[in-house]
Amino acid sequence: MRLIDSTAKISPLAVVEEGAQIGAHVEIGPFSVIGKNVKIGAKTVIHSHVVINGHTEIGEQNQIFQFASIGEINQDLKYQGEPTKVIIGDRNRIRENVTIHRGTVQGGGVTRIGNDNLFMINTHIAHDCSIGNRCIIANNGTLAGHVTLDDFVIVGGMSAIHQFVVIGSHVMLGGGSMVSQDVPPYVMAQGNHAQPFGVNLEGLKRRGFDKPAMHAIRNAYKLIYRSGKTIEEAIPEIEQFAVNEPAVQLFLDFFKRSTRGIIR
């Protein structure tokens, strides 16, 4: 049985399989295909020629544009058809030709996306990725499996991020970057392979960081990247002023949880 709210607007040329759950005021355009295990929240708009498959849960007020593919079988050769998931939050904009693949058992079983993100044309989000809130991935950005983007990350166009890499909050990656190691919060980076070149001060201003916080973040950045010290030598000094500055504590904690190493 299809569970379709009476207020949903579904084109007669769309295919909604038995079992799909469609919320209030959802719109589904012509030639879109919604699989039997899909749940779509209220006021989400699905334009024409979109395919949503697998055990996929989509929240409210999302916009999904033409030729996007969500919840399809992932490209991990170990995948054996297990009922893994894609879970997407609210108010995301998923533009044309975006692909978001379902998770794997080995990676926790879920590809997870938060709220208020923008994925521009041709973005690829592979299995088991975890994306926070208010991130932007520009045209042709590619995330390999198990990549994590914390909140407020911007990924420049034509960039690629290696599997298992973690990108910290408020990071700005320049266009065409190839990222193979973790990028700490607040950092701007670019290149092949990506290298740090400063603190994302403009982004921090836009998000309401005050001058003392930004000054402390810059000092922490300089200790890591410009003092000539190793990370192990710099961390005790950063700990001294992280006590009174939560923004620096976030920076410090990132180094302690990194498993792939930090870009230098």
Swiss-Prot record:
It catalyses: a (3R)-hydroxyacyl-[ACP] + UDP-N-acetyl-alpha-D-glucosamine = a UDP-3-O-[(3R)-3-hydroxyacyl]-N-acetyl-alpha-D-glucosamine + holo-[ACP]. GO terms for cellular component: cytoplasm; membrane. InterPro entries: Acetyltransf_C, Acetyltransf_C_sf, Hexapep, Hexapep_transf_CS, Lipid_A_LpxA, Trimer_LpxA-like_sf. It is found in: Cytoplasm. The keyword RNA-binding does not apply. Its EC number is 2.3.1.129. One of its GO terms (molecular function) is acyl-[acyl-carrier-protein]-UDP-N-acetylglucosamine O-acyltransferase activity. SUPFAM superfamilies: Trimeric LpxA-like enzymes. This is Acyl-[acyl-carrier-protein]--UDP-N-acetylglucosamine O-acyltransferase.
